[in-house]
Amino acid sequence: MAQKAPAAAAVPAKPQAPDGRPAIVVFGDSISAGFGLDAGQSFPDLLQKDLDARGVKYRVVNMGVSGDTTQDGLARLSIALAERPKIVLLELGANDGLRGIPSSVMQANLAQMIEAFQSAGAQVVLAGMTLPPNYGPEFIKRFDAVYAGLAEKYHVTLIPFLMAGVGGHQDMMQRDGLHPNAAGARRVEELVMKALAPLIGAR
């Protein structure tokens, strides 16, 4: 199941002005960016609303860029670090897989980002993805193993599959079969909140 498609052009979201609350940076691709959704429907937008409703004082900084690979993420890593995040949700890699980029390259890029965020004092939550069956079992196996391997090596929280309960469900997906619709984004946010809760003291 494909999770996202490369975008012809993508403009990074502008960081929010600091307001005293610690930052949760969502560093990802089109799933984070809310491709195809109305304003306020992306899962990072929903996450902010959820945090506010729970009285958890964090600000969510959405740095999702449609079409980004892990190499693209490295190129804008300094922008994310400038936010001095307390927590980073790292949601990259699916576009690497869809473009046939070797999993070893993806792994090295993600490792470099994790190390940079951890060195800056941020806790990392790694969002795992997967690929459509037509990419072949061996390629998919190597791709899937990257996330679990990195989570174990760097002792970071892992969401095994960010699109669990969404991907492959027509009522949760847009017509392209790649991106979550509004209902799907809500499901993704629930998974993210579940992973974040122990880190932020949320109930």
Report residues per predicted region.
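Alpha-helical cap/lid subdomain in secreted, periplasmic
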Residues: V56, D72-R203
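Short histidine/acidic/glycine/proline-rich micro-motifs that form metal-
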Residues: I31-G34, D38, G64-D68, N95-G97, ...
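Residue-level signal for threonine
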Residues: S42, T69, N181
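Serine-esterase "nucleophile elbow" of acetyl-processing enzymes
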Residues: A5-S66, R76-R84
